[in-house]
Regions:
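EAL-family c-di-GMP phosphodiesterase catalytic domain
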Residues: 1-12, 22, 33, 58-59, ...
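Structural preference for long, well-ordered alpha-helical segments in enzyme cores
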Residues: 15, 71-72, 85-92, 126, ...
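A short, well-structured catalytic beta-strand-centered motif of the EAL phosphodiesterase domain
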Residues: 29-70, 89, 193
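Catalytic core of bacterial c-di-GMP phosphodiesterases, primarily the EAL and HD-GYP domains
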Residues: 46, 77-155, 231
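Conserved long alpha-helical elements within nucleotide-processing catalytic cores of c-di-GMP signaling
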Residues: 69-70, 79, 161
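Surface-exposed amphipathic alpha-helices with a cationic face
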Residues: 93-97, 130-131, 157-167, 214-221, ...
Length: 261
């Protein structure tokens, strides 16, 4: 092994040790990004947000997820992170309700890793926190990548059967409406799908792109599945999504991630 390889190995080991320590000592931070309902408000909707995770470095520098997620994955630590997110989020909701009576509890999109999906006791862990924190229904909307949901369809059905009776919902992200995909939706029946950025970004520029999104949206609605457009970057795209009757939108034009306080 060369000196450079030894140095890289040492650096990776140090980072892994920091991540393990952070899981034990609260070295991660929760952020939330707003998901905006596009239909006319009835006044009864609860706030909707996606929960994001940041790793707090020694000097309070915030790193984007891409820098530490691969390390967590390599060392099989993602299930521990997912559990930490559920636990911390439940505590935050409980604290907020105590501090502010009548506070509207948001619906929270929580990302799940493949490793967590295969973890048999995760559903029991979630159920315990829902019960202990006396959380209302629909607090957790667990989000899976579309490819992950397809690859682990049986595990998805198992965790749905366990958590849906407790009021948990499910979102599949990165949905593009490709051939055969709606057959899988009929089987897996998520509550939401997030439309992939590639089919949403140009809907204000041409009829074909607009018609494709509208077709996907209508098919989802026919199955009782609500739609979310991600990475919305302009008011023009946002307005087109309203006209097509996509249910929700998320992106920097609506609001960036904000630290949970």
């Amino acid at each position: 092994m060369t000196l450079q390889m030894e140095d890289e190995s040492t650096i990776q080991k140090n980072i892994a040790d920091k991540l393990i320590s952070a899981l034990k000592t609260g070295g991660f931070l929760l952020y939330a990004q707003k998901i905006l309902p596009l239909a006319a408000s009835t006044g009864s909707e609860r706030p909707f947000q996606e929960i994001l995770v940041r790793f707090k470095e020694e000097e309070e520098n915030l790193l984007p997820p891409g820098t530490f997620f691969p390390m967590l994955q390599e060392y099989r630590l993602l299930p521990y992170l997912d559990r930490w997110v559920v636990s911390r989020l439940a505590s935050w909701i409980q604290e907020s309700r105590t501090r502010t009576p009548g506070w509207p509890v948001p619906v929270n999109g929580v990302n799940l890793s493949e490793d967590t999906l295969r973890e048999p006791k995760f559903a029991d862990f979630v159920a315990k926190h829902i019960e202990n924190a006396k959380l209302p229904r629909e607090v957790f909307t667990f989000e899976l990548g579309w490819d992950t949901a397809l690859l682990h369809a049986e595990q998805v059905k198992i965790i749905q059967a366990r958590l849906e009776p407790l009021g948990c919902r499910f979102t599949f992200a990165g949905f593009d409406g490709s051939e055969g995909s709606f057959n899988f939706l009929k089987v897996l029946r998520p509550d939401f799908v997030k439309l992939t950025y590639g089919i949403v970004k140009d809907i204000d520029r041409g009829l074909a792109a607009c018609e494709k999104v509208e077709s996907i949206n209508n098919k989802c609605h026919a199955m009782g599945i609500r739609t979310i457009a991600e990475f919305v970057e302009s008011h023009e795209v946002l307005e087109q999504l309203r006209l097509i009757e996509v249910d929700f939108a998320q992106g920097l034009i609506i609001g960036g991630p904000q630290k949970l306080t």
